[in-house]
Amino acid sequence: MTTNTVSRKVAWLRVVTLAVAAFIFNTTEFVPVGLLSDIAQSFHMQTAQVGIMLTIYAWVVALMSLPFMLMTSQVERRKLLICLFVVFIASHVLSFLSWSFTVLVISRIGVAFAHAIFWSITASLAIRMAPAGKRAQALSLIATGTALAMVLGLPLGRIVGQYFGWRMTFFAIGIGALITLLCLIKLLPLLPSEHSGSLKSLPLLFRRPALMSIYLLTVVVVTAHYTAYSYIEPFVQNIAGFSANFATALLLLLGGAGIIGSVIFGKLGNQYASALVSTAIALLLVCLALLLPAANSEIHLGVLSIFWGIAMMIIGLGMQVKVLALAPDATDVAMALFSGIFNIGIGAGALVGNQVSLHWSMSMIGYVGTVPAFAALIWSIIIFRRWPVTLEEQTQ
């Protein structure tokens, strides 16, 4: 009896440590959103010019997720996690030391390499290490780590950047990663590769129209979100005319609302996943359309950010759950593709926001984001009517 209790505790401790790792990886991806103005000032650049760093990072992840996953498909997972954390930590040290914007971008590419592998294996590892009958809760913990990156990681990173300089933000993330690495070394057993798939899995996955439709929906809706979200910090300060402290509070509010979205999806996702995702996309569309009109009031922007955060968390969870349900025989390949496609959307959205800000007006980022958001809404309605059972019932 005691052995079972201890083993369950250890199993949960392993999953929690993975969730902390997810928090750290997501924090470092999102945190530049809150530091763009400071980094731009440091290198005497325009904020929109620095924003291209977001696109480069995201597209490196998109490009390398599948190749790296296939290259490491037979590598024992504990060893793989240790190696990618070493690369992650070293890259953050370089970010801290970066003496030019080019060096900063190079350091971020190193982080992106580690990111590409991490997110292709994390969901399946959490499921493997979860106590018996607790797979859904394990995935929920990983999702919570992701949500907390928005709730705590991004705002805390911005606060550290405001008071101690943006370099210290990256250094602090590196220290957090080092502590997490030591915990992983202590806790994780040997984890031989399982269900990782191979190149042979790709034609099989590509022949699943429901899965391909989810991938397409993902890239379009993420593009819509990041067209505006990538530049929300300079938008709040330069377009709305509010303080840097309010920009920090708004990021905290938007991220915190994601936890509400996670709770809603946790309660209703099993029965109404498709309806929830479509409703969330419609809510995102409304938020983007109202971004500029809401910029005349801190209260209006605050309320809008709550609904925006709820919508994006439901969308993100819904997409991940459906991908895992539609590819149980090749989870690592499917999640590597998902991570790559998600990051194509991040990069595309950041690039669109960059071009709108440079060549038109940053005030228009919300309106421009409504175009892919509307397309995503129509596509979600079409595919969820076309495959209502396939998407909902394969988890049973």
From Swiss-Prot:
State the InterPro entries in the record: MFS (IPR011701), MFS_dom (IPR020846), MFS_Efflux_Transporters (IPR050189), MFS_trans_sf (IPR036259), Sugar_effux_transptr_put (IPR023495)
Q: Superkingdom of the source?
A: Bacteria
Membrane topology category: Multi-pass membrane protein
Indicate whether Transport appears among the record's keywords: yes
Please list the residue ranges that the record places on the Periplasmic side of the membrane. Answer: 36-49, 102, 157-169, 230-245, 296-298, 354-363
- Give a yes or no for keyword Transmembrane helix in this entry: yes
Q: Which CDD domains match?
A: MFS_NepI_like
Instruction: Cite the entry's keywords alphabetically.
Output: Cell inner membrane, Cell membrane, Membrane, Sugar transport, Transmembrane, Transmembrane helix, Transport
Cytoplasmic topology ranges: 1-14, 71-80, 124-135, 191-208, 267-274, 320-332, 385-396
The regions listed as transmembrane in this protein's record are: 15-35, 50-70, 81-101, 103-123, 136-156, 170-190, 209-229, 246-266, 275-295, 299-319, 333-353, 364-384
**Example GO molecular function term?**
carbohydrate transmembrane transporter activity
Q: Where in the cell is it found?
A: Cell inner membrane
**A Gene Ontology term for the protein's cellular component:** plasma membrane
Note the SUPFAM superfamilies from the entry: MFS general substrate transporter (SSF103473)
What biological function has been recorded for the protein in this entry?
A: Involved in the efflux of sugars. The physiological role may be the reduction of the intracellular concentration of toxic sugars or sugar metabolites.
Which family does the record claim for this protein? Belongs to the major facilitator superfamily. SotB (TC 2.A.1.2) family.
What is the protein name given in its UniProt record? Probable sugar efflux transporter
List the top taxonomic levels of the source.
Bacteria, Pseudomonadati, Pseudomonadota, Gammaproteobacteria, Enterobacterales
Q: Which gene encodes it?
A: sotB
